[in-house]
Swiss-Prot record:
<comment type="function">
    <text>Polycomb group (PcG) protein. Catalytic subunit of the PRC2/EED-EZH1 complex, which methylates 'Lys-27' of histone H3, leading to transcriptional repression of the affected target gene. Able to mono-, di- and trimethylate 'Lys-27' of histone H3 to form H3K27me1, H3K27me2 and H3K27me3, respectively. Required for embryonic stem cell derivation and self-renewal, suggesting that it is involved in safeguarding embryonic stem cell identity.</text>
</comment>
<comment type="subunit">
    <text>Component of the PRC2/EED-EZH1 complex, which includes EED, EZH1, SUZ12, RBBP4 and AEBP2. The PRC2/EED-EZH1 is less abundant than the PRC2/EED-EZH2 complex, has weak methyltransferase activity and compacts chromatin in the absence of the methyltransferase cofactor S-adenosyl-L-methionine (SAM). Interacts with EZHIP; the interaction blocks EZH1 methyltransferase activity.</text>
</comment>
<dbReference type="InterPro" id="IPR001214">
    <property type="entry name" value="SET_dom"/>
</dbReference>
<feature type="compositionally biased region" description="Polar residues">
    <location>
        <begin position="395"/>
        <end position="414"/>
    </location>
</feature>
<feature type="domain" description="CXC">
    <location>
        <begin position="504"/>
        <end position="606"/>
    </location>
</feature>
<dbReference type="InterPro" id="IPR046341">
    <property type="entry name" value="SET_dom_sf"/>
</dbReference>
<keyword id="KW-0804">Transcription</keyword>
<dbReference type="InterPro" id="IPR044438">
    <property type="entry name" value="EZH1_SET"/>
</dbReference>
<feature type="region of interest" description="Disordered">
    <location>
        <begin position="375"/>
        <end position="421"/>
    </location>
</feature>
<feature type="cross-link" description="Glycyl lysine isopeptide (Lys-Gly) (interchain with G-Cter in SUMO2)">
    <location>
        <position position="327"/>
    </location>
</feature>
<dbReference type="InterPro" id="IPR033467">
    <property type="entry name" value="Tesmin/TSO1-like_CXC"/>
</dbReference>
<dbReference type="InterPro" id="IPR001005">
    <property type="entry name" value="SANT/Myb"/>
</dbReference>
<feature type="domain" description="SET">
    <location>
        <begin position="613"/>
        <end position="728"/>
    </location>
</feature>
<dbReference type="GO" id="GO:0005634">
    <property type="term" value="C:nucleus"/>
</dbReference>
<feature type="region of interest" description="Disordered">
    <location>
        <begin position="186"/>
        <end position="229"/>
    </location>
</feature>
<dbReference type="GO" id="GO:0140951">
    <property type="term" value="F:histone H3K27 trimethyltransferase activity"/>
</dbReference>
<keyword id="KW-0832">Ubl conjugation</keyword>
Length: 747
């Protein structure tokens, strides 16, 4: 095997020179194409304007111009000036009018465009500067280094100018492809010249072949070369990487070129894609594969698809609901019910999750068939399993279905001690064909309804419950039930809940005394071990919420409240912990009542229900625009939520440098991880101005696992008053940004 010689310095210099020349040519070509495109658009728009103008001129020529009767000037007004109006038409006489001056109208305050929002919207960090903001000639002359510092904050990355800025090292995908293809032509020419010299002897030795055979052979070789495009030489990527090192190493560039040039079949499915369950190509897949899109796109915290508030989705809860909805009816549902099989009623009594059968009753209803004697040693033990959302498809393999053809009980490879299992005897029947969609749907339904085959059959609609039962036996899912320990977790609430209020107070006082830092909540996911010092909730001094995967008896879980009043004092554990009452935890205060969202006894659930006041937008007496309230509110009453874009602290620092130059900022710290920016997106409360004597105050509240900013009344506010709250500026910033302080008429 021939080992390629390493490239010489002369070769490297040659390729670098080619890279530089081709890159400059492509840059010039891009500029020329941009200029030509702008000229073409200008010519097209100018032609459209000329066409419209010509049509209007033709219409004006068809109209008849009638002279206006002269108005006699009114005498006796010595202070009014007299104006003369002369017409351009020769047939019209001049007109004389008295001039009446209008009073000066106050200008409307400047307002920048913004999009209305009703809740926070999380966005990604902008690592590329979208545009260079115009600050005016004054800022440009006084602070010449501002634009340079702004570009440096984005590492010199400006949108749309990767290839145009001199000295830029970023190459877009389009220019990268064109550059590699252009350099590849030089590589092909070199190889062709080398092949011509090396293959000369072979061609001379085959001159005795007929002319027709030689032409045919050359035609076949030419077609092969044209059909298969040669991958660029490694020297090309090495030369580009040496000229533009910030774009990556040669291996990265090679992989980038391969991804950009791969031809994808438009009809081909992604590698990890399940065919549509309602389509003709539906396949029989496991439950986790059928629900993959559901678990990926559905947010378990917001209960909606494509959630734009949480960057990640919590894993499905491994614990079942308290109000169990699984029940096997003791009576058959029809003539084809599986309960009509011999021993099926005993099976229903034994495997009903709601029934509390004693061991004596289990032994009395136990039925053993002679055909089961050989397989009794490999009986299935009920394993401790949670919600089937976390089960893997390997547990549902039907590898043991052949061994269970005689005895209708599933088995596993490893035997475990368990009570003797029930065997159901049935009459031989014809095999029923199941489609891939039906099998997949059955596995999805079985994770919710378990052994309630009558309900599963009604949901399928194409199979009887007897056929569903037979398929379940074949799938080895007959005993795949959650244990009573997980279905009915031990509840020790009476004494435990009284201790929780003191526990919450201790934790809250500890948080208040130690630090004022608030961290974003992320659900913990360690179901096999308790919450200790390594738990993310404890590390960030957050409570474990209902979205966490820890045990329900976790000492760090927040239990909610059992208040009977309005939950607006520190006697309420939720109010003390600066959080709203959770409708899933607080069942006695009224937070869980959803009959009327406005008439509710609990006063600590206003943000999650959106019980905001009617706000008005008008010019402010202090600065710019202001927010006014249309209805009167009482002290500590919820007014509105401060909504905007959720951005990181680093992104807030980059945006804040621009906002400081504009002397207008809508940034609001949410916690140590995120900031709410209402500059581009927000609601009307964003126009509330700053004051050292405000009538409102802002408070960050935990609402169902999310930090949200609520604006509350600091005192009783009358209808029509302008809303102010303290921005908590420093003394220097307050004098810099707030020039006028409002008059405190109302004490």
């Amino acid at each position: 095997m021939d080992i390629p010689n390493p490239p010489t310095s002369k070769c490297i210099t040659y390729w670098k020179r080619k890279v530089k020349s081709e890159y400059m040519r492509l840059r010039q070509l891009k500029r020329l194409q941009a200029n030509m495109g702008a000229k073409a658009l200008y010519v097209a728009n100018f032609a459209k304007v000329q066409e419209k103008t010509q049509i209007l001129n033709e219409e004006w020529k068809k109209l008849r111009v009638q002279p206006v009767q002269l108005m006699k000037p009114v005498s006796g007004h010595p202070f009014l000036k007299k104006c003369t109006i002369e017409s351009i038409f020769p047939g019209f006489a001049s007109q004389h009018m008295l001039m009446r001056s209008l009073n000066t109208v106050a200008l409307v305050p400047i307002m920048y465009s913004w999009s209305p929002l009703q809740q926070n919207f999380m966005v990604e960090d902008e690592t590329v500067l979208c545009n260079i903001p115009y600050m005016g000639d004054e800022v440009k002359e006084e602070d010449e280094t501002f634009i340079e510092e702004l570009i440096n904050n984005y590492d010199g990355k400006v949108h749309g100018e990767e290839e145009m800025i001199p000295g830029s090292v970023l190459i877009s995908d389009a220019v990268f492809l064109e550059l590699v293809d252009a350099l590849n032509q030089y590589s092909d020419e070199d190889e062709e010249g080398h092949n011509d010299t090396s293959d000369g002897k072979q061609d001379d030795s085959k001159e005795d072949l007929p002319v027709t055979r030689k032409r045919k052979r050359h035609a076949i070789e030419g077609s092969k070369k044209s059909s298969k495009k040669q991958f660029p030489n490694d020297m090309i990527f090495s030369a580009i990487a040496s000229m533009f090192p910030e774009n990556g190493v040669p291996d990265d560039m090679k992989e980038r070129y391969r991804e950009l040039t791969e031809m994808s079949d438009p009809n081909a499915l992604p590698p990890q894609c399940t065919p549509n369950i309602d389509g003709p190509n539906a396949k029989s897949v496991q439950r986790e594969q059928s629900l993959h899109s559901f678990h990926t796109l559905f947010c378990r915290r917001c209960f909606k698809y494509d959630c734009f508030l949480h960057p990640f989705h919590a894993t499905p809860n491994v614990y079942k609901r308290k109000n169990k909805e699984i029940k096997i009816e003791p009576e058959p549902c029809g003539t084809d019910c599986f309960l009509l099989l011999e021993g099926a009623k005993e099976y229903a009594m034994l495997h009903n999750p709601r029934s509390k059968c004693s061991g004596r009753r289990r032994r009395r209803h136990h039925v053993v068939n002679a055909s089961c004697s050989n397989t009794s040693a490999s009986a299935v033990a009920e394993t401790k399993e949670g919600d089937s959302d976390r089960d893997t498809g390997n547990d549902w393999a039907s590898s043991s279905s052949e061994a269970n053809s005689r005895c209708q009980t599933p088995t596993k490879q490893k035997a475990s001690p368990a009570p003797p299992q029930l065997c159901v005897v049935e009459a031989p029947s014809e095999p029923v064909e199941w489609t891939g969609a039906e099998e997949s749907l059955f596995r999805v339904f079985h994770g919710t309804y378990f052994n309630n085959f009558c309900s599963i059959a009604r949901l399928l609609g194409t199979k009887t419950c007897k056929q569903v039962f037979q398929f379940a036996v074949k799938e080895s899912l007959i005993l795949k039930l959650p244990t009573d320990e997980l279905m009915n977790p031990s509840q020790k609430k009476k004494r435990k809940h009284r201790l929780w209020a003191a526990h919450c107070r201790k934790i809250q006082l500890k948080k208040d005394n130690s630090s004022t830092q608030v961290y974003n909540y992320q659900p913990c996911d360690h179901p096999d071990r308790p919450c200790d010092s390594t738990c993310p909730c404890i590390m960030t001094q957050n409570f474990c919420e209902k979205f966490c995967q820890c045990n329900p008896d976790c000492q760090n879980r927040f239990p909610g409240c059992r208040c009977k009043t309005q939950c607006n004092t520190k006697q309420c554990p939720c109010y003390l912990a600066v959080r709203e009452c959770d409708p899933d935890l607080c069942l006695t205060c009224g937070a869980s009542e959803h009959w009327d969202c406005k008439v509710v006894s609990c006063k600590n659930c206003s943000i999650q229900r959106g019980l905001k006041k009617h706000l008005l937008l008008a010019p402010s007496d202090v600065a710019g625009w202001g927010t006014f309230i249309k209805e009167s509110v009482q002290k500590n009453e919820f007014i509105s939520e401060y909504c905007g874009e959720l951005i990181s602290q680093d992104e807030a620092d980059r945006r804040g440098k621009v906002y400081d130059k504009y002397m207008s900022s809508f940034l609001f710290n949410l916690n140590n991880d995120f900031v709410v920016d209402a500059t581009r997106k927000g609601n009307k409360i964003r126009f509330a101005n700053h004051s050292v004597n405000p009538n409102c105050y802002a408070k960050v509240v935990m609402v169902n696992g999310d930090h949200r900013i609520g604006i509350f009344a600091k005192r009783a506010i009358q209808a029509g008053e302008e809303l102010f709250f303290d921005y908590r500026y420093s003394q220097a910033d307050a004098l810099k940004y707030v020039g006028i302080e409002r008059e405190t008429d109302v004490l």
